Amino acid sequence: MARLFRPLVLLCGACVLAGGLLSWQVAYGSRPRQVDLGFWFEPVTFSSLRLGGPLHASELALIQTLAEREIAQAFAGMRIRVSARRDTRYRIRVVQDVKDARFQRPVHVAGQSRGMTGFGGEGVVSFEFAASSAVVYASAGMVRGQIVEAIGRGVGRSAVHEFTHQLLPRAPIHASRDRSSYEYYSAARVEQYFGELRWDLAKPLLQARLAAAPVGD
């Protein structure tokens, strides 16, 4: 009898352990996870007669800070964390210039991305495009500092647009006709650099997938 009892105890103990692990997985493993977005600058430069010369190192640092702030503000309230990590599933680099690979002739664009549902995505944003556009759309009375800030906003907003393509690769976000939206198809507009932007048709799609868990959950 003792020989039969001992294996029975071991079997029951294994069942209890397996049940405990399953309960832990249900309680914790099924919780929505944070989505990491990698965002960083490669070496970039810009010079303009309107600015009176090239951008200084301190101005480039400010532009990066403002761009990161734009991304964080756009995705506030969602399970998204922005960092300079380069090993994230979703990532964007700011580079000097971006040419549209669909054309044989050089066509400069604000950015481009590729993404696949469930796998992530990667993309680039053109610093030259954002900086040049900020200069073009700046009103006559604006000073250098205001234009530098506009460059930061433009870079960040282009990154938000490209991240949206990666996060929602099948969503027709370019269908938006709201010029003050993140989804608008063109960065060649004054709203990209001056004033506030808002979400349009992508917002409910992003919230359905990335809404933050309730406080205390």
Which residue ranges define each predicted feature?
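N-terminal Sec-pathway targeting helices
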Residues: 1-14
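Bacterial Sec-dependent signal peptides at the C-terminal "C-region" and cleavage site
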Residues: 13-33
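Fold-level signature of zinc-dependent metallopeptidase catalytic domains
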Residues: 26-67
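Soluble periplasmic/extracytoplasmic beta-strand elements of cell-envelope proteins
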Residues: 36-40, 93-95, 182-184
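A mature extracytoplasmic/lumenal domain signature
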Residues: 41-43, 86, 187
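Short, polar loop/linker segments at the starts of domains and inter-domain junctions
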Residues: 47-61, 139-144, 193-205
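Metzincin-family zinc-dependent endopeptidase catalytic domain
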Residues: 57-175
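The catalytic-center signature of Zn2+-dependent metalloproteases
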Residues: 147-217
